[in-house]
Amino acid sequence: MTIHQLSPESQWKIVSSSFIYGPVAAVRELLDNSIDSGAKKVFIDVDSTTGGCEYISVKDDGSGVDIIDRPSMCLEYTTSKMSSLGDISILTTLGFRGEALFLLSNLCNQKGSMQVETKTADDVIGEKWLVDSKGGITNGKRYKVSCPVGTTVILRKLLGGLRARYLEISSRPRKTFDELIYLINHYSLIHRNIRFYFSLVSLQKNGAIERKQMQETLDPKISRARSLSLLARLKKPVPLNFIVEENFVIDEKINLDLILPRMVPESDVINIKRRFKFLSVNERALSLNLETGKTISKLLSSIYRDFSLLDPMVWFINLNCDTKLLDVNIEPEKNDVMIKSFEVIFKKIENKLKLLLEERIGIETNMLGDKHVQPSINEKTSPALVIPTPDAENEISKGCGAVSGKDKTDIPQKNSDLIVPTFYDEANLENTTIVAATPSPTKFSEDKALDEQTQLTISSYRSSSSGSMASEDSTNWRHNFQQELSENSEVAGAGSSTLPSSLTYNYIETIPENEDLELSKDASISNPFMITKIRNVNKKLSENLLEAKRTSCGDANKRGMPNERQLSNTEKKELIKLQQTYGKRNNTVDMTIPRNSKKKVTDNYIKKASCMHKTRPKLMHFSEYTNNYVYTLKNEKIVKHDSDNFAKETLWLRSRDDATSPSSSLLQALRAHVKKPGHIEATTNEWCLFTPDSP
């Protein structure tokens, strides 16, 4: 195969496709130009269907492009940021090659187009034009357009000439959106004086924008640490989550702007699983997948592991160093740098970060009472409390009882509540077992009575502990299931007849009286003996609770209602008779009460009605869900009865139910013949008056 030269068109297609992989790289190049132009607001619009393969627009409010520079704006190897290779060592801008716009125009013109719109502060009106595949103005035509000061670049069908890449990237727009959001957030954290707006747009068939929806933006008025907290959606204050340092000096040529997480349990940054890691050098965003970013990310994780902390997932580091120590021209996307004497600088950064974390997190853990705080080097002893055994106390008390009364006065009285720490050597404590015990009651001589305070103290000691292990003074000790099983059981196969089992003759099940039994961490829940014991305890507890509920209900019934009035036997009989008399309807007569006594009973009931009905209605509720509490619902409205109205009603009832009453019989006969609606009223003379209703 002979060697031949590629055509210029094929050359630039190959170069441009290798430099501009997709929409993310194209947006990055346009953002660099907007930042270099001094913009304060940058708007990024991407089509929502293909993730930028069909439409990308980057608009800024920078200085714009002068009229004399517009024809050469997109030509290859044209730039306003440097004039020779030596200027790279003193470079302060993000762009410097002069080929990004040319490569973008070459890619877009294969199937689409590239449009530029700009205006400077000195221009009366702006201009727009299309860029051809060689970076020049298409047909040399520029059009006047009304636009604000700044520059807008619109890319259409960026990957139209690369079919395979277009299908691959356009089929996963969600991944492209995530990468763009990460890139824009990275730039927002680095350049806090610029506000970036990221939006998704929908296109019509003719390419016009149909709908636009903003997705991401960060207010530049808030601090960088607060912005990072918003990105990670942290709720707690920034000082509790982050360590913030500005111009953290490493040496005379390097300093850091950093935000490191406090990976302590009190912060909520410890729960973040998604990565929010941002690294930059001289405000140039770096990728964590390349050499420099990967090395610093691993360094930070190793430092946190040395402090027994989780790997940090949210942090920001901007390394400011002399430009003469950097080489930024090592990657096509300019997202990696080479640092001179990187190993030495790397070691300095590691030592400084360790000191910073030790100072900040170490002070915090000490304030929070962290158990990992190491004691001082000179401290060789540790305090221990000396608790006398019961036998030792008895010996002391016996000795005190043998002393005469004269000698007792010479002995100073010591405060029994005072605990004096005794220091032991740590080497001697290795084989020492510390047992916390409840002190037994102290014995006193017969001629000395216990004062009230001592009696209260001893009684409180006895009531504070509970359990099933009894000591000499009948004091129960707190224990767990595992300890009780180990004491009451024997080795399997030993043939002991005292083995606590349900198969034992005359076996009586014993249920522990302690309701505060704890399950040991070493106990196995799958053990059938353990399950049986737990069920027995739960059964006993449920029985006790049921008994307590019954007792509380019984007490409530015994107490009764405080507002209830107790009636005498005579009143109860009269009330029952009255209810039987007036409880029946349909002109039936109660034969249990003589007719001549009805009026007398009614009059007595009228006299007693006012006092009998002054009690307030009350309803008592009890349920197993009320936790043994009985609550009462009261009706505060007192029922008031008018004796006159009540007398009229009873008179009418008596007249209606009495078949022998002439007035009642007459009215019943009249109502059958008079076919008019009316009403019946009782007069004061015990007559009934029928009045027809007026038509």
From Swiss-Prot:
GO terms for cellular component: MutLalpha complex; MutLbeta complex; nucleus. Keywords: DNA damage, DNA repair, Nucleus. The lineage of its organism: Eukaryota, Fungi, Dikarya, Ascomycota, Saccharomycotina. InterPro entries: DNA_mismatch_repair_CS, DNA_mismatch_S5_2-like, HATPase_C_sf, MutL/Mlh/PMS, MutL/Mlh/Pms-like, Ribosomal_Su5_D2-typ_SF, Ribsml_uS5_D2-typ_fold_subgr. Present with 72 molecules/cell in log phase SD medium. Gene3D superfamilies: 3.30.230.10, Histidine kinase-like ATPase, C-terminal domain. It is found in: Nucleus. The keyword Protease does not apply. GO terms for biological process: meiotic mismatch repair; mismatch repair; reciprocal meiotic recombination. Its main location: nucleus. It comes from the Eukaryota. This is DNA mismatch repair protein MLH2. Involved in DNA mismatch repair (MMR), correcting insertion-deletion loops (IDLs) resulting from DNA replication, DNA damage or from recombination events between non-identical sequences during meiosis. Component of a MutL heterodimer with MLH1, which probably forms a ternary complex with the MutSbeta heterodimer that initially recognizes the DNA mismatches. This complex is thought to be responsible for directing the downstream MMR events, including strand discrimination, excision, and resynthesis. Belongs to the DNA mismatch repair MutL/HexB family. Heterodimer of MLH1 and MLH2. One of its GO terms (molecular function) is ATP hydrolysis activity. It comes from Saccharomyces cerevisiae (strain ATCC 204508 / S288c) (Baker's yeast).
